[in-house]
Amino acid sequence: NFPLAFSTAGGDTASALAAGCPVIVKSHPMHSGTGELVSSAIIKAAKKTGMPNGVFSNLNSSGIAVGQQLVKHPKVKAVGFTGSIHGGTALYKLANERDEPIPVFAEMGSINPVVILPSALEAVGATWATKYASSINLGAGQFCTNPGLVLGIKGDQLDAFSKTLSQEILKLEPTFM
């Protein structure tokens, strides 16, 4: 989802380490290299600050089996997840099927609907279309706060907004994570 902020060194990791808990991260296979680099920095910082050896681990796997086994393991006491609704729901189900259910802190789906009314479109529609297009592309489209779904009332204002938005999206340069 967003490997530099949520995946490896995100709030879940920082919170657990701050509370004195060890952390095991199962990296997403699409950014395992980034995960390894960030993990190296975390391990270096842990050593530098006197944390115990093994307080942080990063596991790489292209499938879901490693994540499933981590959630099922009796020594794991909580799960943090950022990603799809399907993946998060599957982990939540596994966590609750354990003899001792554990909490799952999941950020999933991020469709982020935006409701726009004709009066707002009439006042600032063209400007807002430009800003909306930029927001969609923010962070290579990986920010969980990016807008995803526009809800509006059918009419001339929405048609004009849609046309301007399409033009603005076509102007965007592809970006890399």
What label would you give each PLM region?
Residues N1-S134, L151-L158:
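Rossmann-like NAD(P) dinucleotide-binding subdomain of oxidoreductase/dehydrogenase enzymes
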Residues I64, G109-I111, S119, G141-L149, ...:
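Flexible, acidic loop-helix segments that line cofactor/substrate-binding pockets
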Residues I136-G139:
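Active-site C-terminal subdomain of aminotransferase-like
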